[in-house]
């Protein structure tokens, strides 16, 4: 599975909606960069089981974004902040601070 590192932003936004196990799997694979085998072996699972579980978490994050659109809204606010940075730097900086960028 090719790693889509943009998922880490979705994880930052929606990780609290995942179960502990889902967060652990996501972190192991995407943040700590462990292979499917490295995750599977200590747990006595197959690579395929771990692949399916990681894919499920990935799909869940995309589902949350499709419904809640927090990343989309953050991206729009960031673009707005960038566009007004020349006119009103204080407001631009405040928007960036609010969205955490």
Regions found by a protein language model. Give the residues of each.
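C-terminal flanking helix
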Residues: 58-65
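Short, Lys/Arg-enriched N-terminal segment that forms or immediately precedes the first helix
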Residues: 2-15
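Residues within the DNA-recognition helix of helix-turn-helix
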Residues: 53-56
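Short amphipathic alpha helix immediately N-terminal
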Residues: 20-32
């Amino acid at each position: 599975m090719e790693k889509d590192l943009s998922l880490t932003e979705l994880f930052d936004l929606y990780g609290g909606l995942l179960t502990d196990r889902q967060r652990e799997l996501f972190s192991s694979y995407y943040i700590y960069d462990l292979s499917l085998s490295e995750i599977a072996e200590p747990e006595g699972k197959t690579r395929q089981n771990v692949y399916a579980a990681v894919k499920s978490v990935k799909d869940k994050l995309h589902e949350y974004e499709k419904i809640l659109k927090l990343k989309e809204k953050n991206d729009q606010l960031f673009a707005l902040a960038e566009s007004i940075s020349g006119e009103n730097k204080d407001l631009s900086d405040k928007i960036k601070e609010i969205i955490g960028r």
